[in-house]
Design a protein with these regions (language model features):
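Accessory C-terminal segments flanking Radical SAM cores
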Residues: 1-117, 135
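A detector of helix-start/N-cap boundary segments at the beginnings of structured domains
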Residues: 5-8, 138-142, 195-196
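N-terminal pre-triad scaffold of radical SAM enzymes
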Residues: 14-22, 128-157, 219-220
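Short microdomains enriched in Cys/His and/or Lys/Arg
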Residues: 49, 109-127, 168-203
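Canonical Radical SAM [4Fe-4S] cluster-binding loop centered on the CxxxCxxC motif
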Residues: 27-32, 133, 141-194
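Radical SAM/AdoMet-radical enzyme domain recognition
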Residues: 203-221
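Short boundary motifs at domain starts and secondary-structure transition points
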Residues: 124-133, 210-212
């Protein structure tokens, strides 16, 4: 078993971003906080599932490069190096406190220990290199929330099939029905993996992705 920098360390903030279909960025799709460009052109942090969220921001105004190097992401990386629990990752902390294997723990294995429970796939990155030189290697794009599934761990922000369920459970879940945005400002510094969520997409998607990110090695669907 590999030795991690701390008990709260996660590969995602050091290697990945998710671009939400509302135009903000997070370290992963499970994070409950995101970063975006405010209306005053300054970085703002958003609470993803707070129905009383009042912070105004400009969707897609921040590039992936800016997001990955934002104060928000740097704070997450720093707190994890210090063994602290960042509030953006509360979903994983709750699962781990209950004795459930969290996404953080599972993805650490995928990225660092692909031979542990992952016979197919995996990356086996070098931890020291990731810590010393965080680089954007994986960008998870959500083009819209059109989907024919309503997976238990998902939300209406990623699947419109959840909207009717949210309406029934509005006292417990934040309503999120996000419309499609076509103009994406994308920049990946050292990318090799691009993951998209089921939804509408242009017929020339793959050609456009390769044009935007020529160093891409893998497109995962």
């Amino acid at each position: 078993m590999k030795s991690y920098p701390s008990d709260t360390w996660c590969t995602y903030p050091f290697t990945a971003l998710v671009l939400h279909n509302g135009g903000s960025y997070g370290p992963c799709c499970s994070a409950n906080e995101a970063v975006a460009m405010g209306t005053d052109d300054k970085e703002v942090v958003l609470e993803m599932y707070n129905p009383n969220q009042k912070t105004e921001f400009k969707p897609y105004a921040m590039s992936a490069y800016q997001a990955f190097n934002s104060k928000f992401m740097k704070d997450i990386r720093q707190q994890m190096m210090e063994g602290k629990r960042h509030t953006a990752c509360s979903s994983c902390w709750r699962q781990e406190d209950l004795g459930i294997k969290s996404k953080r723990q599972g993805m650490n294995q995928v990225y660092i220990e692909p031979g542990v429970g992952h016979a197919d796939g995996g990356f086996e990155y070098d931890i020291d290199e990731m810590v010393k030189n965080p680089r954007l290697r994986s960008l998870d794009l959500k083009f819209d929330n059109k989907c024919n599934l309503h997976c238990l761990m998902c939300t209406s922000g990623s699947s419109d099939m959840w909207v009717p369920l949210d309406n029934k459970m509005h006292k417990y879940l934040a309503l999120q029905n996000v419309t499609k945005e076509d103009d994406l400002d994308l920049y990946m510094d050292d990318a090799h993996k691009w993951q998209w969520t089921p939804g509408e997409f242009p017929e020339t998607l793959y050609e456009e992705i390769k044009r935007l990110v020529p160093q891409l090695q893998e497109i995962q669907c």
